[in-house]
Each structure stands twice: as structure tokens, then as C-alpha cells.
């Protein structure tokens, strides 16, 4: 029924919107392919690669914003996002033409051209606009305050006082090297996170979420408070291949929350269990959340070493969650799901090799000491 409704909604869309969505998907697919090729053949000049990565994703981000605003008939926002989308394309071209010059440029004393200043300002502004749209004002305010502190640190009293950077030096550090905007964060997202996100999306698209839900039902579905325990187990398993709490909620929550409510849990408790269970995916090896890649980059530790030390944390996290669910089920007198309503174990694990083999390859390569990029690419 949902598939039929989705097909009907797509058929009722204006032709221009269908074309725009199709072009966006092609652009996203090309971006994924480009990252896979770069992971295989090498990234080349780090500065140019990171700048290209950021330019492409700014283009995709504002293209999506533009499509959404056009669909909502918001003329002013559409015009603004159209400008940002166009400038993101110009930014991509700029880095292809000027990337080598900026790479070879001597910091602080090298020449700075007006076009460099223009794209430096645009890059910072575009990032702030995207952050405001997806996260909100608090993160934007934090970024702006930190930039102002870097510039006017001499006005701050006490231990936080420093001489301050001039605007020209601030521009040099933040935009014209691999220490600012194009520093460790962009390095991690462009080389590691993108590959693991693609890996998780691929497994999800070929039916991993259905397998996980059925497998979790077979494991704990009949136990006391079974539906809520299924939510915890399925979120833990999905977190192993995704690591993204939001994707975890969307994928497993659509199935487990209605099941929990139907079995007798309150709306608040059902939502809380799914939120907590999905958040735990960020600390569940081997993929975990994006933060672990930054930790690995900053501390200089192997990703596999960090992941192995998080196993106990993840186990304790989900054991505590299952214990809490069991206590709530005991308090309310809730039983598990009748076995005849659950999928059979043989049916649940049928075709599991499609997910287990690539996942096993990923885990093996990380344990064997291969680089994170190679492990993600092989998976």
C-alpha cells in the first residue's frame, strides 16, 4: 500500500520536479562513484581533493534545498538557493583551476587574489547557511563566536586572552591550507565516512533492515516485553552497519514503534526506547558514528583499536537498555509476541549471506590491520 501511494504521489508531481529529482539522483550517484574511484586509485593532492569534496556536497545540499523550496513555492528562498547552487558549481571549477596554485603557495607571504577572497567568504557563508538549515542557529552562533574570538582574542580578559589573528592571516589559515576548513574533519568525511555511509546504504537497500527485524524477532520476540526488546536488538544490529542514529530511527522505528504501542507500551515509552536504542548505534562496532573517525584522526590511533575498545561499552549499553525494558514489561504485565505471529528462524536467516559476507569482509580487514579506507572499499 505504501509503495502504491508513493508511486501515485510521484505520478502527480510536475514534470520539472520529476526531472529535477532524477538529475539530483544522478549527481548523487556520480558523487558516490567518484569517491569510490578516488579510494581505489588515490586522492592525489589532498587540498584539491578535500576542496572538491566540499564543493560537490555544497552543490548537492543547496540543490536539494532549491528543489524543496521550489516545491513549496517559496520564491525568495528559491532565488537564494539558486544563487548558492550556482556559486557552488563555480567554486568547484575554481578549485580545479586554482587548486595547484593554492597548494604550492607559501603560507602567509604568498599572493592572495580577489577571487580567493571571494570564494573564501562564500565557502564560510555557504557552510553556515547549510548548518543553520539542517542543525539550527546554536551551531551557527558557536562557529561565528569562535571565528570572532580568533580575530579579537586580545579583547578577552584572563587565560583566554591572545594576540588575535589579522583577517588576512585568518583567511590564510582557514581557507588556503589543510589546517582550517579543509582540515581533519573534511579529511575524515571525504576519505572514510563517505565509504562507510555508502556501505550501510547498500546493505539497507538490498534488504538488510528486513533481515535485521526478522532476526531480532526470532531472538527476543517471544520474551517478556518482546516488541521493545526487538527494538533494542534490531537497533543494535542496524547500528553495526550504519552507525547513524537518525537512519537507525527511520529504518527500525517505522516497524518497532507501532509494534511496541500495540503491545501495551505508552507512546512516550515507545519513542524513548527507540531513541535510546538508535543512539547506541553510534558506539556499536564496527562502523559506529562519524565521531570515531575524528577521534582516530586526532589521537592517531587505528580505527580497529578504537572499535575493539568500544565493544564492552556497547554491550553494557544494550544490556542496561534490555534490563530496563524487562522491568517496565514486568511492571505492566506485558507478555511477548506469540511465536506463531513471528517469522520462522530458517525463513529469517534465508539469504543472510548477502549481508553477512560483505560485513564479514569489512570486519576481517579492520582486524587484520588494513587501512580504514581499504576496509570500507572492500566491504
Annotate the PLM regions:
Residues 1-111, 117-121:
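Conserved, well-structured core domains of diverse proteins
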Residues 25-38, 57-66, 86-95, 122-131, ...:
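Hydrophobic core segments of alpha-helical transmembrane domains in multi-pass membrane transport
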Residues 44-48, 72-77, 103-198, 347-348, ...:
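Hydrophobic transmembrane alpha-helices of multi-pass solute/ion transporters
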Residues 93-98, 249, 262, 281-293, ...:
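Transmembrane-helix bundle segments that line or gate the permeation/cavity pathway
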Residues 213-281, 300:
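Hydrophobic transmembrane alpha-helices that form the pore/transport pathway of multi-pass ion
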Residues 296-312:
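Helix-coil boundary and interhelical linker segments in multi-pass alpha-helical membrane proteins
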